């Protein structure tokens, strides 16, 4: 087994059913890595250099569950990661020590019907990192199947950690059937909404209108894509009233009458019932509302609006077969996600990172946790590390 010597203690970021958040020792230990213990066939050991905090990480911490996925014990968070290969099992031939990789955070069975038909995101036996009871990637070192470690070449680890949320939006673009010139609504200007904006712009959608309740996030969207049109959602307005404002914004302030252009597609990135309903009332006859955001178990939606307007309501679950494309898009400059990382912290300061990510007043878009203060300083200075 090929391996590098490690000297730092492996620590991880944990939560539990009591909603505590703390840093503690994790596995594999530095001693095990140096002794070549614990690495299974087909696996590599990775030093995790950057990990983004996802809204689901904050939700597992604060709420203890997402639907049926429940935190039942001490649980390591994090699933948006990139790092460097430290050790390689003898049967792994396509990776070597020192390779820079992004970690696709799933382990599938390769035996069920979804796996055998190429839709492995539906694997009935999947172990998805950071989804209870499977520990996540917010650790200094982690063992992971080599087949789910994608080479990123000279891409920064910061960009490598953005490949996971980019994969979410690429799955949405593909499944939704977005085409060149399609008028588009994006509801929610959080990280997924903003990455959807960049992805949809690259895919040729126009015009695009994006909504949010936060004026600052809409301004951020405008700084990313100056031609995007924005609509600030006012709390208390009905879905129909919001739809009128959205259509007016899509038409550059020229009104929302019967002849106004309506979105052919809405990418719903909030999972909030009122936002889903606003999207349903906004799209054209024969349009589609594609739900990316994760919401509550049950919602009330305007069924007859969907029925009489032949509006399709469609969803996605994670992603599959998207990572190679995501890597190419970033490497070739088609999509630039670098501006979305607004805050960076070392692993030792991960608790502060979570406080920043969970507080709307900080203005954070994407918070990343890096393996060392040196990495934080390099990334903040715009240096590739």
From Swiss-Prot:
PANTHER family: L-ARABINITOL 4-DEHYDROGENASE, SORBITOL DEHYDROGENASE. SMART domains: PKS_ER. Zn(2+) 1 binds at residues 54, 79-80, 164. The keyword RNA-binding does not apply. One of its GO terms (biological process) is sorbitol catabolic process. InterPro entries: ADH-like_C (IPR013149), ADH-like_N (IPR013154), ADH_Zn_CS (IPR002328), GroES-like_sf (IPR011032), NAD(P)-bd_dom_sf (IPR036291), PKS_ER (IPR020843), SDH-like (IPR045306). Optimum temperature is 40-50 degrees Celsius. Optimum pH is 9.4. Active from pH 7 to pH 11. It catalyses: L-arabinitol + NAD(+) = L-xylulose + NADH + H(+). Binds 2 Zn(2+) ions per subunit. Catalyzes the NAD-dependent oxidation of L-arabinitol to L-xylulose in the fungal L-arabinose catabolic pathway. L-arabinose catabolism is important for using plant material as a carbon source. NADP cannot act as a cosubstrate. Zn(2+) 2 binds at residues 109, 112, 115, 123. Pathway: Carbohydrate degradation; L-arabinose degradation via L-arabinitol; D-xylulose 5-phosphate from L-arabinose (fungal route): step 2/5. Its cofactor is Zn(2+). Keywords: Arabinose catabolism, Carbohydrate metabolism, Metal-binding, NAD, Nucleotide-binding, Oxidoreductase, Zinc. Belongs to the zinc-containing alcohol dehydrogenase family. Transmembrane segments: none annotated. It comes from the Eukaryota. SUPFAM superfamilies: GroES-like, NAD(P)-binding Rossmann-fold domains. NAD(+) binds at residues 191-192, 212, 217, 292, 316-318. PROSITE patterns: ADH_ZINC (PS00059). CDD domains: sorbitol_DH. This is L-arabinitol 4-dehydrogenase. Its EC number is 1.1.1.12. One of its GO terms (molecular function) is nucleotide binding. Homotetramer. It comes from Penicillium rubens (strain ATCC 28089 / DSM 1075 / NRRL 1951 / Wisconsin 54-1255) (Penicillium chrysogenum).
């Amino acid at each position: 087994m090929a391996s590098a010597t490690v000297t730092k203690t492996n620590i991880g970021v944990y939560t539990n059913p009591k909603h505590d958040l703390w840093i503690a020792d994790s596995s594999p230990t530095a001693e095990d890595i140096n002794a070549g213990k614990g690495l299974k066939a087909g696996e590599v050991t990775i030093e995790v250099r950057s990990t983004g905090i996802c809204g689901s990480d904050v939700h597992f911490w604060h709420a203890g569950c997402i639907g049926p996925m429940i935190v039942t014990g001490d649980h390591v968070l994090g699933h948006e990661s990139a790092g460097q290969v430290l050790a390689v099992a003898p049967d792994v031939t396509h990776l070597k020590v020192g390779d820079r990789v992004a970690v696709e955070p799933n382990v599938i069975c390769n035996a069920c019907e979804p796996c055998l038909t190429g839709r492995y995101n539906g694997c009935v036996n999947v172990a998805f990192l950071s989804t209870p009871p499977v520990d996540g990637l917010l650790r200094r070192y982690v063992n992971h199947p080599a087949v789910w470690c994608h080479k990123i070449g000279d891409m920064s680890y910061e960009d490598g950690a953005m490949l996971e949320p980019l994969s979410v939006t690429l799955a949405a673009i593909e499944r939704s059937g977005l085409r060149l010139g399609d008028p588009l609504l994006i509801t929610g200007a959080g990280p997924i909404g903003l990455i959807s904006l960049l992805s949809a712009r690259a895919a040729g959608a126009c015009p695009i209108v994006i909504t949010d309740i936060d004026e600052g996030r809409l301004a951020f969207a405008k700084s990313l894509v100056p031609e995007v049109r924005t609509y600030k959602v006012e709390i208390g307005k009905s879905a129909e009233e919001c739809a009128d404002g959205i259509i007016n914004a899509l038409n550059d302030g020229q009104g929302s009458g019967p002849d106004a252009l309506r979105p052919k597609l809405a990418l719903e990135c909030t999972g909030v019932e009122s936002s889903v309903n606003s999207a349903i009332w906004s799209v054209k006859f024969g349009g589609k509302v594609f739900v990316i955001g994760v919401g509550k178990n049950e919602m009330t939606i305007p069924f007859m609006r969907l029925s009489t307007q032949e509006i399709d309501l469609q969803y996605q679950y994670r992603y599959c077969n998207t990572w190679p494309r995501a890597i190419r898009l970033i490497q070739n400059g088609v999509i630039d996600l670098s501006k979305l990382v607004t805050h960076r912290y070392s692993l030792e300061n991960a608790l502060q990172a979570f406080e920043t990510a969970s507080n709307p007043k900080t203005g954070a878009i994407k918070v990343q946790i890096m393996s060392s203060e040196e990495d934080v300083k390099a990334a903040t200075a715009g240096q590739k590390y």
